[in-house]
């Protein structure tokens, strides 16, 4: 049977696009994929970012509120409509709590209460946490996308990782949506196919205050992997500015709240 895997992109809650995320969760409830995987940066943790260090943002005291927003905006609504497997991958933004403790309060290292799975209640929501790239499908690794250099072209960062690792790669981090691939053949016979698949983002662009003039070559969306035995077919899903998107010939998406 054909397995359908939904791959969610960077949300960076609380800087997520509320309408887009609600639309994707609504789609998941109707589509009922076999598995859900997220490429990382589900939360942002700006209070403990190195960019915030020593500024007013570090002293806001709203870290718990941001953690609660993750549950309220994503995990709780998702679990109301979907009971299947959910997997999260480590990422640079989700590394921030560990990095902050390691560099500012090393005496607290190893305290599970300060680790991301505890901060965001992964056990309560049935979320499996991965600290390394992992095999999501035959011949495919899921990674965050910050494990190598960045490409300006959508799919290029993932393909570079694929060349380095010898697997096809699906990742996030770049906020770009697209596929690059290279196939090899000899004597008219395909000997290897390798894909680099980047799944876009679910951020609210206006929340990225660090962008000059609000400009970025980013694409909102997510991904689907269709798995049939050892054959994997990647499919990017573009989210239009009005929040709608098309999967398998059917339009999904919710109007603005």
Model-derived regions, located:
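Short coil/turn segments at beta-strand junctions that form active-site/ligand-binding loops
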Residues: 3, 32-34, 83-85, 138, ...
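Short acidic low-complexity segments
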Residues: 119-138
């Amino acid at each position: 049977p054909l397995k359908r895997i939904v791959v969610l992109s960077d949300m960076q809650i609380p800087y997520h696009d509320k309408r887009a995320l609600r639309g994707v969760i609504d789609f998941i409830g109707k589509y009922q994929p076999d598995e859900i995987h997220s490429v990382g940066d589900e939360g942002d943790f700006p209070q403990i970012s190195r960019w915030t260090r020593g500024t007013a943002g570090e002293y806001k005291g709203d870290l718990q509120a941001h953690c609660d927003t993750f549950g309220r905006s994503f995990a709780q609504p998702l679990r109301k409509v979907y009971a299947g497997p959910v997997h999260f991958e480590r990422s640079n933004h989700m590394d921030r709590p560990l990095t902050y403790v390691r560099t500012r309060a090393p005496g607290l290292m190893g305290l599970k209460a300060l680790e991301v799975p505890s901060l965001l209640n992964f056990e309560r929501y049935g979320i499996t946490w991965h600290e390394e790239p992992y095999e999501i499908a035959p011949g495919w690794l899921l990674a965050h996308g910050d494990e190598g250099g960045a490409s300006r072209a959508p799919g290029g960062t993932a393909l570079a990782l694929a060349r380095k690792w010898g697997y096809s790669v699906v990742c996030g981090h770049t906020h770009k949506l697209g596929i690059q691939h290279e196939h090899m053949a000899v004597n008219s016979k395909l000997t290897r196919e390798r894909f680099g698949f980047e799944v876009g983002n679910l951020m609210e662009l206006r929340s990225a205050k660090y962008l000059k003039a609000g400009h970025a070559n980013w694409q909102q969306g997510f991904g689907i992997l269709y798995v049939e035995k050892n054959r994997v077919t990647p499919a990017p899903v573009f989210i239009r500015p009005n929040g709608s998107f098309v999967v398998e010939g059917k339009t999904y998406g919710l109007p603005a709240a």
